From Swiss-Prot:
Enzyme active site: 267, 282, 845, 1220, 1248
Cofactor-binding details, from the entry: Binds 2 Zn(2+) ions per subunit.
Protein name as catalogued: Pentafunctional AROM polypeptide
Sites where the protein binds NAD(+): 47-49, 84-87, 115-117, 120, 140-141, 162, 180-183, 191
Region (3-dehydroquinate synthase): 1-391
Organism annotation: Cryptococcus neoformans var. neoformans serotype D (strain JEC21 / ATCC MYA-565) (Filobasidiella neoformans)
Summary of the function given for this chain in its UniProt record: The AROM polypeptide catalyzes 5 consecutive enzymatic reactions in prechorismate polyaromatic amino acid biosynthesis.
CDD domains on file: DHQase_I, DHQS, EPSP_synthase, NAD_bind_Shikimate_DH, SK
GO biological-process terms attached to the record: amino acid biosynthetic process; aromatic amino acid family biosynthetic process; chorismate biosynthetic process
Length: 1611
């Protein structure tokens, strides 16, 4: 057989069989081309990556074919750089010029060999060269094979968007050689599979069924090279079954595309169908490219657009579930919460508004209406075109949260069925898989839980699943109990599916060793699953001979389960925690080696109805379980299960889920409407079917229940009866539904249910202790979330008490945190039906049991649901209107502090809690309260192991809290147990914060020696150093961040200055990690920024000079690679010790509040860290993330695996992804530079590219490059400069974080680096920084020092601005001319114009509105904005000077003296400091009363008529009266200031009077030990610094500005 022969499948398009599909086709391709497309010149266009692999084979195949055809044609090759950048006008023109240079004529045949980029580019060249020449597509990626190569679309990209310039130009042939796929990364194959799945979904349901049922074989054929014959698959005779499957699905996809193109070549209607998933997918891709591939984005789009169709009532949930599982089977993401997406910096830009905005320009749209291809079932679309869909429908699908619009259900009376029971579905899957024969299961729940169960059973080779009736029926071919282990290295991942984990534990124990290649199976799950108990089941199995190992925490997943471990015989099992343990053994018992007798121990058996359900179902599959009785005929908890093999019934119908039915029934109860559940009645196997009769009927509902249906009619709204005492043990999952009803049940409970000692309107639910170990601690969750409505609750050992309140008195606008728990979300949806504006934060958690719950709520029940986009990823779950007493913080998880005894956890924790307006708790104190012993006493009596157990139990309770400003210091040894470590790791994995507080070992030892032994701290029994060494790796592994506690003063600081600096850094750190304040400058072209590059080997000697060094800089670059413990600059690549780096960074933090750029520069990139040690580089970079640096530099030269791992840990830190070319070989107009930029944008929030200028021309090329890449929508900030003297102009023109130096630094970090002052002066000279004029308005102002203050700042930084006085008693024409002048830079405003200026401004800050005065005018984008910096100055003066011990503002008071205009700023500042009471004194009380009346009551202002009788001594005293108004002399005419006012041991006195420098108040306070004084001139400076920074965007050079003022002041 000739080597140029092959068995190909030919597909017709536009009347020609021009698509040829097969394997190993190169010889066939060139034989076909040379014989059917004769030419004088064949031009191959490919990229450099592919040419390196295939070019020799191409040339050989061409030469052989040409020789056989006696063809003397030329074979020319043109290579382009790989990547999307090649699809440009520039590259197209270069190809055309090259072809013309090579004398190519109209008979030229162009061959496009590559992916979509090459195909699109080459096709457009062919369409336009010589007005059109023939071309051939030879696609190499699966995406190109099934999509871009078929249909004749060709195009290039422009700065305005992708594919905007092109033509329809059909190729002469499309050769699809599937053998090329075996050289692709698995991710690229999956990328193409998204399009294959999409096509099957819209057109070919049989291909879709093949794709979902044979995914493993299809994936194997696409990714594995054949063994033996290298060309296996070229002919049918040597083609494997897997290859045939791959060929079938790929050719089927191509056929659909070809058929549609044939009917609608120019995309006028039908061809739009192939864009299913693309409307939303393209929008996602526009934000995430290039980090996420096209197919990955389309995969998410497919699921979301399917959900749109489901929401519209067009598509069933079964179809959505099938699509989701099929895409997942090929490794594709299916939601925006996929870890691969959330780990990307760009994911923060995936707002609903942004995506909808991008969708506006979709080519399918007609005008403003958005069009989406809607499925009606698998294999068929709703219309033969894209359908118009409203924005609110799309928005609801995209939003992560929903709000239920409180109203009476419009569809009442309602008759509906709920999804299949999760409990029955999971049992049916196990029974049918273990049984013999085929079973058709109907009404199976299609959810996350059942999906993982099915996937696991397939991995165990226990069953084959397929679908009928459009997916409504699942066909199970049982394996008869023959199971084998998954493939090597494959774990069974179960997510948070508790039922599946428990059932599969026993299933895995019965796996046959003889049928397996591996000795054991590992089952695992997500972080929460690893906390849920499974110990009693494992104990029972191991006692029975099974070998089960805990791989992490004892008592929880993951488990390693050996084969052949289910011996049988007599098994004892503790069943007081979960009935699922019992069901697990029951279901598998018939296959044990011996007949099983199962004895339940441990007291009352939980959820007996579910055990009865399991036994009843086993009987339907042929196994009859006998429950034994005692001599009196009473049932015992002993079950005998015969050995047998299940026989599958031909059909099995899953009963609807009774737990899910409680929600629509409860909605009827709470809204006074009627609902009938058509397929659950009194004959149900499920315990929750009793909910209507036993819960709703006693609450006042009319309940009508038959064997198969349940009808509920609720009483009038607001008349539900309380439950009183009720046992919900038979239906524990339904307690959440009962709880939300009890919250608004205000009529007295039935007399027989009354609980002594509780009100008649209380509901006491018991028998639900197991609900603490479900998806979350549901009892605690219910209490925390009900509190947001103002509902009071209590709990006891196995239940909860709810005190009902009228719904009218409840808080509106609560934002409900769902804990990823479906039942929490659906329960609060019930309450939301009468409490408006309630937000359910995690709408998707309902997918566990009722994926289309929100759609059914609107479409079937008639309660409107709207999408809600939360403000941030850690949006508050505690917001409510009116403001409730619950914490209003941004993050909803507590902050844990860990670290060695003596590291400073209490010191840091107290400051952190105060800064976050929260609570501090020492876990050891909680332990002492609960155990009534100190830790030392407890350890002495019970030992360390028992203490660690109790300590971990306390930790577990804290973890369940949802108060983001609760700071908890844990004991130093919390990391000693695996369980506690895993709990902390899980907390971090969920986005929680665990901060390792640390100090140098010797510092901690010295501190502990200084305080000696204490009664509350037990001895370790080993040396401190040994304990430190053992725990340090655990602290690192369990924490998200690290806070290095520097207790000694740095940079010449006094003790007082050090204390202030520590508080400032503590505030920055904790506000930063919790997302409250980023401490980063605004990066934009209009706001040029720079950072100072520190080049010291040891920064500590320079800290005293840091204020001067950082003048004009917006950040400080901490060059880690230049550090050295010797204090000498490193001369060869070396790694500074991490502990040394951490301390250096912490010391630097105490000397500056500027953001830090944490840079670890490798040798090849111009630094001193070795370039061959990725692990060490990664460790140093991760330290920057752990220490909460605002920016971390990440070199993109390192392996992608390292880069990906670092980006996933970034949290609030912004990554500066960098590339430095020290050779000068990379040209700014070259493709390599574009490729580096793409890489930097992929990994960074900021891209940094540094070239080397050889001439001034390189700066011009750089400017062109920046202009091109920054013109793309969504482009990230770009720092692009040239090194060398010739590149200095690029530094002057660069607006984003320009690296700068200072004359006092030991060296410049890079050649050509300039100082900040030099850059600003150069910008002024070149006109890029125009001179602005600043003024002070008011009268009298002749003696004002404001011009000195601001002009000193301008001069220090090299700014060309000026500040002058403009005296005026009113806002006259002269004032208006100044503020409307084009060179107006800003204004200070003093009396009498602070109020008069407001009508002439475009906007005023909320602060200034409340105060009623503007003292600063700021031009912003052609508009004038008013601000008040007076209150900011007062606030700063108080906060910085208050002693840390006096910082419990919430329980302290402040005093403001005076009722003039400035007092309002002082009151506002004290309110912002959270003082519980603000005393206001004025000599004329009536004026003080007027001031009080103008502020909200929440400010708690108390007018006092005498300073001698204050109810409580204040912590802060602010005087706003003239300097001589107060007196210490009782006989003086002024206001007498009694000493009692300053009787607090510590405090701050602030006098706003400009002169005298030391007023009576300040003199008195100065004599009081512990009191700090702030004179008026300091307030003037502080408010001026704020103004300077608002106007210039630069940090004020405070020392020099203050000096200029004080020199004049004291002159």
């Amino acid at each position: 057989m000739s080597s140029s022969s092959a068995d190909v499948l030919k597909i017709s398009i536009l009347g020609n069989e021009s698509i040829h599909v097969g394997f190993h086709l190169l010889p066939y391709i060139f034989k076909t081309i040379t014989t059917t497309l004769p030419s004088s010149t064949y031009v191959l266009i490919t990229d450099t990556n592919l040419s390196a692999i295939y070019l020799n084979d191409f040339k050989a195949s061409f030469e052989e074919a040409a020789s056989e055809a006696d063809n003397k044609a030329r074979f020319l090759v043109y290579e382009v750089a790989p990547g999307e950048g090649a699809k440009s006008r520039k590259v197209k023109g270069e190809i055309e010029d090259w072809m013309l240079d090579n004398k190519c004529t109209r008979d030229t045949v162009i061959l496009a060999f590559g992916g979509g980029v090459i195909g699109d580019l080459t096709g457009f060249v062919a369409a336009t060269f010589m007005r059109g020449v023939k071309f051939v597509q030879i696609p190499t990626t699966l995406l190109a094979m099934v999509d871009s190569s078929v249909g004749g679309k060709t195009a290039i990209d422009t700065p305005h968007g992708k594919n905007l310039i092109g033509a329809f130009w059909q190729p002469s042939y499309i050769f699809v050689d599937l053998a090329f796929l075996t050289t692709l990364p698995t991710r690229e194959v999956s990328n193409g599979m998204a399009e294959v799945i999409k096509t099957a979904a819209i057109w070919k349901d049989d291909d879709f069924a093949l794709l979902e049922s044979r995914s493993a074989e299809i994936s194997l054929a696409a990714s594995s090279r054949p063994t033996g014959v290298p060309t296996a698959g070229r002919f049918v005779s040597d083609r494997s079954h897997a290859q045939s499957l791959l060929l079938q699905v790929v050719s089927g996809s191509i056929y659909v595309k070809a058929h549609i193109v044939t009917i609608d070549e120019r995309e006028t209607g039908l061809r739009n169908l192939v864009n299913f998933g693309h409307t939303i997918g393209h929008a996602i891709e526009a934000v995430l490219t290039p980090a996420m591939l096209h197919g990955e984005c389309v995969s998410v789009g497919i699921v979301l657009e399917a959900e749109v169709a489901r929401q519209l009532g067009i598509l069933s949930q079964v179809a959505v579930g099938r699509l989701t599982r099929c895409l997942q089977a090929y490794g594709l993401p299916v939601s925006l919460s996929d870890r691969r997406i959330t780990a990307l910096p760009a994911s923060s830009q995936l707002s609903v508004d942004r995506l909808l905005d991008i969708m506006k320009i979709d080519k399918k749209n007609s005008g403003p209406a958005k069009k989406i291809v809607l499925l009606s079932r698998i294999g068929k679309t709703y219309e033969e075109k894209a359908s118009v869909v409203a924005d609110d429908v799309i928005s609801k699908v995209l939003c992560e949260a929903v709000t239920v619009k409180a109203a009476t259900p419009t569809k009442s009376p309602i008759t509906m069925a709920t999804p299949g029971s999760k409990s029955i579905s999971n049992r049916a899957l196990v029974l049918a898989a273990l049984g013999k024969g085929t079973c058709r299961v109907r009404n199976l729940l299609h959810s996350d839980d059942t999906a993982v169960m099915m996937n696991a059973l397939v991995e165990l080779k226990g069953a084959v699943f397929s679908w009928e009736d459009g997916g409504d029926t699942i066909v199970v071919e049982g394996g008869g109990g023959i199971l084998s282990t998954p493939a090597k290295g494959k774990e069974l991942y179960l997510g948070n599916a508790g039922t599946a984990s428990r059932f599969l534990t026993t299933v895995c124990a019965m796996v046959s060793g003889s049928a397996s290649s591996e000795r054991s199976t590992v089952i695992t799950g997500n972080a929460r699953m690893k906390q849920r108990p499974i110990g009693p089941l494992v104990d029972a199995l191991t006692a029975n001979g099974a070998k089960v190992k805990y791989l992490e925490s004892t008592g929880c997943l993951p488990l390693d389960i050996d084969t052949d471990g289910f011996r049988g015989g007599h098994i004892q099992l503790a069943a007081s925690v979960s009935s699922q343990y019992v069901s697990s053994i029951l279901l598998c018992a018939p296959y044990a080696a011996e007949q099983v007798t199962l004895e339940l121990t441990g007291g009352q058996v939980i959820s007996q109805p579910y055990i009865d359900m399991t036994i009843a179902m086993m009987k339907q599959f042929g196994a009859t379980v006998e429950r034994q009785k005692d001599e009196q005929g009473n049932l015992l908890d002993i079950y005998v299960i015969p050995k047998c093999t299940y026989v599958n019934p031909p059909e099995y119908s899953v009963e609807s889920d009774a737990s899910s039915a409680t929600y629509p029934l409860a909605i009827a109860a709470i809204t006074g409407t009627t609902c009938t559940i058509s397929n659950i009645g009194s004959s149900s196997l499920q315990g929750d079917a009793r909910f209507a009769k036993e819960i709703l009927e006693p609450m006042g509902c009319i309940v009508e229940q038959t064997l198969t249906s349940t009808k509920v009619t609720g009483p009038p709204v607001g008349t539900l009866r309380a439950l009183g005492n009720v046992d919900m043990e038979p239906m524990t999952d339904a307690f959440l539904t009962a709880s939300v009803l009890a919250a608004v049940a205000v009529k007295p409970c039935l007399p027989e249910r009354k609980v002594e000692g509780l009100p008649e309107t209380a509901s006491r639910i018991y028998g639900i202790a197991n609900q603490r170990v479900k998806e979350c601690n549901r009892i605690q969750a219910m209490r925390d979330q009900l509190a947001k409505f103002g509902i009071e609750t209590d709990e006891f050992d196995d239940g909860i008490i709810i005190f009902g309140k009228p719904e009218a008195s409840l808080f509106r606008g609560a934002s409900i945190h769902c804990y990823d728990d479906h039942r929490v979300a659906m329960a609060f949806a019930v309450l939301s039906c009468i409490i408006d504006e309630t937000i359910i934060e995690e709408k998707r958690c309902v997918e566990k049991t009722w994926p289309n719950f929100w759609d059914d709520l609107q479409n079937k029940i008639g309660v409107a649901v709207e999408g809600v986009e939360l403000e941030t990823h850690n949006q508050a779950s505690t917001s409510a209107k009116p403001v409730s007493p619950i914490d209003q913080s941004q993050s909803d998880r507590p902050i844990f502090l860990i670290g060695m005894r003596g590291a400073g956890k209490t010191y840091v924790g107290r400051m952190a809690a105060d800064i976050l307006s929260g609570q501090f708790t020492d876990a050891d104190d909680v332990f002492a309260q609960e155990s009534h012993q100190t830790v030392s006493e407890f350890v002495a009596a019970n030992g360390w192991d028992e203490f660690r157990k109790k300590e971990t139990e306390i930790l577990s309770k804290f973890v369940e809290e949802h108060r983001g400003n609760h700071v908890i210091a844990l004991g130093g040894g919390i990391v000693e147990t695996e369980t506690a470590r895993e709990t902390l790791k899980a907390h971090v994995a969920k986005g929680g914060h665990v901060v390792h507080v640390t100090r140098a070992l010797e510092d901690i030892e010295a501190y502990l020696d200084s305080i000696g032994n204490t009664a509350v701290r037990p001895n370790w029994g080993e040396t401190f150093a040994d304990v430190f060494k053992r725990r340090e790796p655990w602290y690192q592994a369990c924490s998200s961040h690290e806070f290095y506690n520097v207790l000694e003063a740095v940079g010449g600081q006094t003790h007082e200055e050090h204390t202030k600096a520590m508080r400032a850094e503590c505030g920055r750190f904790f506000k930063f990690i919790t997302g409250r304040e980023s401490n980063r400058p605004r990066l934009s072209v209009g706001n040029p920024t720079s950072f100072l590059s520190l080049t010291f080997p040891d920064v500590t000697p320079a800290l005293i000079h840091l204020d001067e060094l950082t003048e004009g800089a917006d950040a400080v670059e901490f060059r880690v690679d230049l550090l050295s413990t010797t204090g000498q600059a490193p001369t060869r690549p070396a790694l500074p010790p991490i502990s040394f780096v951490a301390k250096q960074l912490a010391s630097l933090r105490l000397a500056t509040t500027l953001p830090i750029v944490f840079s670890v520069r490798s040798k090849d990139q111009g630094g001193m860290v070795p370039s061959d040690n990725a692990e060490a580089y990664g460790a140093l970079v991760r330290l920057g993330l752990r220490c909460a640096c605002e920016y971390v530099d990440l070199e993109v030269c390192w392996p992608e695996q390292l880069l990906d791992s670092i980006v996933q840990l970034k949290r609030e830190t912004h990554i500066i992804a960098s590339w430095h070319d020290w050779t000068g070989d990379m040209a700014w107009d070259g493709e390599e530079m574009k490729a580096k930029h793409v890489l930097c944008e992929k990994y960074g929030d900021v891209a940094k590219i540094v070239g080397t200028a050889k001439s001034g021309l390189d700066n011009a090329k750089l400017a062109i490059f920046v202009g091109e890449v920054q013109s793309h929508p969504g482009a990230k900030p770009l720092l692009a400069i040239n090194m060398g003297a010739a590149g200095q102009l690029s530094r002057i023109l660069n607006p984003i974080l320009t690296p700068v130096t200072h004359d006092a630094l030991p060296s410049r970090a890079a050649p050509g680096q300039l100082t900040a002052r030099e850059i600003l002066q150069a910008r002024a000279l070149t006109g890029s920084l125009p001179a602005k004029k600043f003024v002070l308005f008011g009268s009298p102002i002749a003696h004002s020092v404001s011009p000195l203050l601001h002009n000193a700042g301008f001069a220090t930084l090299g700014l060309p601005h000026t500040y002058r006085l403009h005296e005026s008693e009113k806002v006259d024409q002269g004032v208006l001319e100044v503020i409307r002048s084009p060179d107006f830079g800003g204004a200070s405003v003093t009396i009498p114009l602070k109020l008069d200026i407001i009508p002439h401004l475009d906007s005023v800050s909320e602060d200034a509105k409340i105060i009623g005065a503007v003292n600063t005018v700021i031009p912003r984008g052609g508009k004038l904005h008013g601000e008040n910096t007076d209150w900011q100055a007062i606030h700063q003066a108080a906060a910085q000077n208050l002693d840390a011990d006096a910082l419990s503002y919430g329980s302290s008071t402040a005093l403001v003296i005076g009722a003039g205009g400035t007092c309002r700023a002082a009151i506002y500042a004290m309110h912002k400091l959270r003082f519980k009471t603000i005393y206001l004194f004025n000599r004329t009380p009536e004026n003080a009363a007027k001031v009080k009346a103008s502020f909200p009551e929440s400010y708690n202002i108390a007018v006092v008529t005498s300073l001698s009788s204050l109810p409580e001594a204040p912590v802060v005293v602010v005087s706003t009266v003239p300097g001589n108004s107060l007196t210490l002399d009782t006989f003086s005419q002024g206001i007498y200031l009694p000493s009692e006012v300053l009787s607090r041991p510590k405090g701050v006195a602030i006098d706003l009077a400009y002169k005298p420098h030391m007023t009576a108040l300040l003199h008195a306070a100065e004599k009081k030990e512990g009191w700090k004084v702030v004179p008026g001139v300091e307030i003037l400076c502080l408010q001026g610094f704020k103004q300077f920074e608002e106007w210039t965007g630069k940090r004020a050079p405070q020392k020099k500005m203050r000096k200029a003022v004080l020199d004049k002041y004291f002159a």
